């Protein structure tokens, strides 16, 4: 084969959400910090080309993300990574941290210790501690100690053409979220409503980013509302979520960074305290354990340290390559399967 670029990937899913972990063949990513590497991926033509190569057709699919492993910068970290999606590279993700941890352990890149292995992941948002329960050579469950999460603004109200005034919380859990009580748009969080939820999420994300500017007070590379997460409460008290992702799909997992952002709003409203735990349930019924382990501050703002626990499962191992004569090397997407915003890719 005459490929001019070859990368190895290990396919993992976390509670239904796919994270394809790049384990070999990636070029060196410039930057002295992971935040600088994230910025390069999102601003340099070479970074954009690598992201498109891995995430778009014919090599990529709408479902899931690509987790690009990087050499760690921090002396305590075992590995660093950024999350590649069709829109851009992202700073942090709970489900992708679980996928990366599972891949590192089950591939042997990090030595597995039974019954428990602790891995420190370095992200652009900070260090994430992953405590993996291990047995018989497999990673059974991963508990993440997430980055400090904080509220940007509660009860933001915006005008919408379809639902009138919609109220949302803008909160940070590793990236910024608009958190919306789903009943405001006349829907429930279930698989049959996935397409309608996605369309609503794309509309609301566009509207809120037009009206507000959000920037992390300490990490300026992290800015803008990345996702809209719809939320509801099930009969058993579990929080049901649906995170909508550009260009138009629903997260299959309960969403780790989204639940971290939501936990910050619950703490701000006095609804949870240190030591509390609860279940979060996704649109497909998969679950995370969510906990409030500690409180802290970020640039003078009250913040929480969330824990998120879930399972990762490996299901594939493959290579992707680029033929130098392939006219579609830059990748493409179409609205038939990629969602309503695919025409803007």
Curated annotation (Swiss-Prot):
Q: Which residues are responsible for catalysis?
A: 93 (proton acceptor), 255 (proton donor)
- Which UniProt keyword terms apply here? Isomerase
**Induction pattern:** Is up-regulated when the bacterium is grown on t4LHyp or t3LHyp as sole carbon source.
Q: EC number(s)?
A: 5.1.1.8
The record's catalysed reaction(s) read:
trans-4-hydroxy-L-proline = cis-4-hydroxy-D-proline
Q: Does Isomerase show up as a keyword for this record?
A: yes
Q: By its UniProt entry, which InterPro entries does this protein fall under?
A: Pro_racemase_fam
User: What GO molecular functions are on record for this protein?
Assistant: 4-hydroxyproline epimerase activity; trans-L-3-hydroxyproline dehydratase activity
Any single Pfam family the record assigns to this protein: Pro_racemase
> Top EC class per UniProt?
isomerase
Which SUPFAM superfamilies does UniProt cross-reference here? Diaminopimelate epimerase-like (SSF54506)
Sequence positions that bind substrate: 85, 94-95, 251, 256-257
Cross-referenced PANTHER family, in alphabetical order? Answer: BIFUNCTIONAL TRANS-3-HYDROXY-L-PROLINE DEHYDRATASE_2-EPIMERASE, TRANS-3-HYDROXY-L-PROLINE DEHYDRATASE
Q: What does this protein do?
A: Catalyzes the epimerization of trans-4-hydroxy-L-proline (t4LHyp) to cis-4-hydroxy-D-proline (c4DHyp). May be involved in a degradation pathway of t4LHyp, which would allow A.tumefaciens to grow on t4LHyp as a sole carbon source. Can also catalyze the epimerization of trans-3-hydroxy-L-proline (t3LHyp) to cis-3-hydroxy-D-proline (c3DHyp) in vitro. Displays no proline racemase activity.
Q: Which family does it belong to?
A: Belongs to the proline racemase family.
Protein name (Swiss-Prot/TrEMBL): 4-hydroxyproline 2-epimerase
Record organism: Agrobacterium fabrum (strain C58 / ATCC 33970)
């Amino acid at each position: 084969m005459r490929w001019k670029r070859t990368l190895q990937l290990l396919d993992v899913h976390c509670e239904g959400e796919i994270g394809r972990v790049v384990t070999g063949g990636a070029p060196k990513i410039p930057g002295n910090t992971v935040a600088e590497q994230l910025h390069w991926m999102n601003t340099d033509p070479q970074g954009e080309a690598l992201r498109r190569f891995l995430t778009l057709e014919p090599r990529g699919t709408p479902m899931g993300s690509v987790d690009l492993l990087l050499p760690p910068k921090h002396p305590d970290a075992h590995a660093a990574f950024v999350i590649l999606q069709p829109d851009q590279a992202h700073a942090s993700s709970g489900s992708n941290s679980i996928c990366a941890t599972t891949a590192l352990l089950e591939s042997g890149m990090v030595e597995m210790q039974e019954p428990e292995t602790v891995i420190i992941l370095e992200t652009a948002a900070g260090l994430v501690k992953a405590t993996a329960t291990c047995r018989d050579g497999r990673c059974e469950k991963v508990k993440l100690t997430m980055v400090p999460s904080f509220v940007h603004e509660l009860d933001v109200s915006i005008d919408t053409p379809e639902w009138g005034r919609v109220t949302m919380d803008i909160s940070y859990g590793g990236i910024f979220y608009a958190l919306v009580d789903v009943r405001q748009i006349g829907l429930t969080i279930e698989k049959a409503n996935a397409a309608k939820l996605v369309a609503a999420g794309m509309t609301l994300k566009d509207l809120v980013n037009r009206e507000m500017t959000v920037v992390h007070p300490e990490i300026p590379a992290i800015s803008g509302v990345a996702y809209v997460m719809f939320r509801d409460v099930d009969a058993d008290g579990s929080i049901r979520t649906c995170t909508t992702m550009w260009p138009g799909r629903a997260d299959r997992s309960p969403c780790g960074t989204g639940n971290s952002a939501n936990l910050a709003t619950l703490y701000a409203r006095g609804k949870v305290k240190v030591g509390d735990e609860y279940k979060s349930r996704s649109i497909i019924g998969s679950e995370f354990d969510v906990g409030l382990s500690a409180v802290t501050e970020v640039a003078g703002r009250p913040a929480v340290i969330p824990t998120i626990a879930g399972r990762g499962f490996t299901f594939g191992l493959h290579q992707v390559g680029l033929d130098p004569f392939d006219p579609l090397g830059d990748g493409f997407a179409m609205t038939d399967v990629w969602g309503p915003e695919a025409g803007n890719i």
